[in-house]
Design a protein with these regions (language model features):
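Helix-loop-strand module that forms the ligand-binding subsite of alpha/beta enzymes
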Residues: 60-147
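Cysteine-cluster motifs in flexible loop/terminal segments that predominantly coordinate metals
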Residues: 42-69, 199-207
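N-terminal beta1-alpha1 ligand-phosphate binding loop
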Residues: 2-30
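A short beta-strand-loop structural module common to alpha/beta enzyme folds
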Residues: 32-42
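Glycine-rich phosphate/pyrophosphate-binding loop and the adjoining helix
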Residues: 141-207
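Short, hinge-like loop/turn segments at secondary-structure boundaries
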Residues: 51-55, 132, 161-162
Length: 207
């Protein structure tokens, strides 16, 4: 089994990366393969609503989103991590997720997702809430911990070690991800599959 961990920080080796590496270690100890995918400064644009991905399964903007689309089907679960910028996820993370879920939602459907939010101080819960909108739109089980998935540090990744509760929460999140993956795998072996819906019902608020 494999978990793909997305780093939405512009700082490749910063605090968000340290949080993901902490979770990766916990997952690896439980025989879960991991890969950290750096989003950072590689996003070249926002979703334009052109619909091009509906025809090709790829975004017309050729950047790290298409790189992610090439590998998301290989993963059994996902962790989406972001720093907090003005009480929101990073702009690059939002642009990345908008396009990733628009083009590749079917490859991630029914697979568990976890969120991790890293900040110097405030704005964590509102950033966490924004990140939740993506997996909960896509029929993905959301992995929770013993507290909201928040850890604190500023610039220096070593500061993350000072937030003992935050690290414990991230560890719990990773342990629960491993447990959920094993549960899903056991269910599949027992012949239990998701109830696939052939066609959604679409209505507009304005008639």
């Amino acid at each position: 089994m494999k978990v793909l961990l997305f780093n939405g920080s512009p700082n490749e080796n910063g605090c968000t990366d340290a949080a993901l590496r902490h979770m990766s270690k916990v997952l690896t100890e439980r025989n879960i393969q991991t890969e950290i995918f750096q989003i950072g400064r590689r996003v070249k644009g926002v979703c334009m609503g052109c619909g091009g991905c509906s025809d090709t399964g790829r975004c017309v903007i050729d950047d790290c989103v298409n790189e992610a689309l090439d590998i998301i089907s290989e993963a059994d679960g996902y962790v989406f991590a972001t720093p907090v910028h003005f009480a929101s996820p990073s702009g690059d993370m939002i642009a990345f997720l908008d396009r990733l879920f628009y083009a590749g939602s079917s490859a991630m459907r029914y697979k568990p997702a976890a969120i991790a939010v890293i900040a110097r101080r405030g704005g964590c819960t509102s950033a966490f809430d924004a990140m939740l909108k993506y997996p909960t739109y896509n029929q993905m089980p959301v992995v929770s911990g013993d507290y909201w998935p928040i850890a604190h540090a500023h610039v220096d990744p070593a500061q993350l070690r000072c937030d003992e509760e935050g690290l414990f929460t991230l560890s719990t999140l990773a342990r629960n991800m491993a447990w959920m993956l094993r549960c899903i795998e056991a269910g599949k072996k027992a012949g239990i599959q998701p109830e696939y819906v052939e066609k959604n019902i679409w209505t507009n608020f304005i008639r």
